[in-house]
């Protein structure tokens, strides 16, 4: 019994952003952002066990913002798991204001396990 393999290659551009979200007024004004649960579960699997174990207490994480051109910024945020949801706070509001994000801006997020930090990008 032969099995068929699908060897068709696509020409879609590479998209590294595991988590994508369109920012809301609430995300921008409340001092925290709740991250989409299903997408964030993919990121948690890549993180160190000790870090994940302490999410209930809140852990400081580095966030490297990737910009077009030579500019980039680093921020320290608090990542917390509360009532089954993960959220950034403790630095989120300052980052939002410094980068002038607006409602409906799309952001992308991924975990860089080698440098143990988040990579963050303003997609559009």
Swiss-Prot record:
UniProt DNA-binding region: 18-124
Record's keyword annotation contains Nucleus: yes
GO molecular function, one term: DNA binding
InterPro entries for the chain: B3_domain, DNA-bd_pseudobarrel_sf
UniProt keyword terms in alphabetical order: DNA-binding, Nucleus, Transcription, Transcription regulation
Annotated GO CC locations: nucleus
Subcellular location: Nucleus
The protein's name: Putative B3 domain-containing protein At1g51970
């Amino acid at each position: 019994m032969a099995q068929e393999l699908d060897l068709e290659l696509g020409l879609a551009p590479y998209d590294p952003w595991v988590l994508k979200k369109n920012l809301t007024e609430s995300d921008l004004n409340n001092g925290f952002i709740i991250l989409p649960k299903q997408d964030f579960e993919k990121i948690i699997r890549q993180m160190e066990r000790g870090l994940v174990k302490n999410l209930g207490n809140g852990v400081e994480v580095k966030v490297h913002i990737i910009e077009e051109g030579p500019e980039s910024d680093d921020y320290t945020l608090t990542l917390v798991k509360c009532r089954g949801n993960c959220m950034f706070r403790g630095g989120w509001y300052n980052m939002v204001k410094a980068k002038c994000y607006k409602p409906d801006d799309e952001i992308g997020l991924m975990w860089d396990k080698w440098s143990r930090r988040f990579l963050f990008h303003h997609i559009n």
